[in-house]
């Protein structure tokens, strides 16, 4: 399972560098374009887009994972530095969930408990929203399969993007639970979601929020509990994440659950002046 997450072991002689591998793995625009194309062709109510005949042509999720990291990127990743795109442990036994949450740009995501994902009740209704649902779920849970056929490039991209979409839709539910909020609390305390850019909020820690609960409607924003306004994330990588993976409810329910974490509103507002005189505000 993801034996090549550390950047080697699948390529044989000379494996690609970690940044090169991830440059291809997180090329969301290319992958999402492929998924959009597929969603237009298929019925949105279909939970599994393969017939029994089609299933024989699709390999196991473990094969998909190997190809995900062994495939060379079409273009170089757009990075600000030459540092690694992944933080934390990169051992061979890293789960897909840990690997995904540690990708550059995915810092807003917390790790969803596998027990939560394995409970069918928590996934109610998602099979009709995500194409290749069963394969995407197997990929997330690192489930091995005896099917040894190979993905086509298009099928590989579909399952890869479907797994990201499915995890996001599970994530938005999980962060409304007690365990999910506790995980997000740690990130909030560590300023993982960023600080409010407003001067008079004095670097207030923010929370992720979506402007819509419908997937692919808008990207994630950050909500400042002090000035109660929303802003674009500072990182362009985080700015590409679907806002539906965090939803419109989370920050407000979070602050109700942790009332002691809600800051007082700023006492000062900026006042425009010209040569020291306040500018008259015409109504």
UniProtKB/Swiss-Prot annotation:
**Where would one find coiled-coil regions in this protein?**
none
GO BP: circadian rhythm; photoperiodism, flowering; positive regulation of circadian rhythm
Question: What does the UniProt entry say about where the protein is found?
Answer: Cytoplasm, Cytosol
The UniProt entry, under InterPro entries, shows: Casein_kin_II_reg-sub_N, Casein_kinase_II_beta-like, Casein_kinase_II_reg-sub
Keywords from the named record: Cytoplasm, Phosphoprotein
Give me the Gene Ontology terms describing cellular component.
cytoplasm; cytosol; nucleus; protein kinase CK2 complex
Domain of life assignment? Eukaryota
Tell me what PTMs the record reports for this protein: Phosphorylated by alpha subunit.
A Pfam family assignment: CK_II_beta
Which stretches does the entry tag as region Disordered? 1-23, 35-92
Specify residue ranges for compositional bias: Polar residues: 58-70
The residue ranges flagged as biased composition, category Gly residues, are: 7-16
Q: Which SUPFAM superfamilies match?
A: Casein kinase II beta subunit
Name one molecular function that GO assigns to this entry: protein serine/threonine kinase activity
The entry sums up its family as follows:
Belongs to the casein kinase 2 subunit beta family.
Function comment: Plays a complex role in regulating the basal catalytic activity of the alpha subunit. The tetrameric holoenzyme CK2, composed of two alpha and two beta subunits, phosphorylates the transcription factor PIF1 after an exposure to light, resulting in a proteasome-dependent degradation of PIF1 and promotion of photomorphogenesis. CK2 phosphorylates translation initiation factors. May participate in the regulation of the initiation of translation.
Q: Which PANTHER family match?
A: CASEIN KINASE II SUBUNIT BETA, CASEIN KINASE II SUBUNIT BETA-4-RELATED
Its assembly, as annotated, is: Heterotetramer of two catalytic alpha subunits and two regulatory beta subunits.
Under what name is this protein listed?
Putative casein kinase II subunit beta-4
Species the sequence originates in = Arabidopsis thaliana (Mouse-ear cress)
> Coding gene?
CKB4
């Amino acid at each position: 399972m993801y034996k090549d997450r550390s950047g080697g072991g699948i390529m044989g002689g000379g494996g690609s560098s970690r940044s090169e591998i991830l440059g291809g793995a997180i090329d969301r625009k290319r992958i999402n374009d492929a998924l959009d194309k597929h969603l237009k062709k298929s019925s949105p109510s279909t939970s599994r887009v393969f017939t029994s005949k089609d299933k024989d042509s699709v390999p196991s999720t473990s094969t998909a994972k190997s190809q995900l990291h062994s495939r060379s990127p079409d273009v170089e990743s757009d990075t600000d530095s030459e540092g690694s795109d992944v933080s934390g442990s990169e051992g061979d036994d890293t789960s897909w969930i840990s690997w995904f949450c540690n990708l550059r740009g995915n810092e807003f995501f917390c790790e969803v408990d596998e027990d939560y994902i394995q409970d069918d009740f928590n996934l109610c209704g998602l099979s009709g929203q995500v194409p290749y649902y069963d394969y995407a779920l197997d990929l997330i849970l690192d489930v091995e399969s005896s099917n040894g056929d190979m993905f086509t490039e298009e099928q590989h991209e579909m399952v890869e993007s479907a797994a990201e979409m499915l995890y996001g839709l599970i994530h938005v539910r999980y962060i409304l639970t007690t365990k999910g909020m506790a995980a997000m609390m740690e990130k909030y305390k560590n300023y993982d979601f960023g600080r409010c850019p407003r001067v008079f909020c004095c670097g207030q820690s923010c929370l992720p929020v979506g402007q819509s609960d419908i997937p692919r409607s808008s990207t994630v924003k950050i909500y400042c509990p002090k000035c109660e306004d929303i802003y674009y994330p500072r990182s362009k990588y985080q700015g590409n994440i679907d806002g539906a993976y965090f939803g419109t409810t989370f920050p407000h329910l979070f602050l109700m659950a942790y009332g002691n974490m809600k800051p007082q509103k700023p006492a000062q507002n900026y006042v425009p002046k010209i040569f020291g005189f306040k500018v008259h505000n015409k109504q």
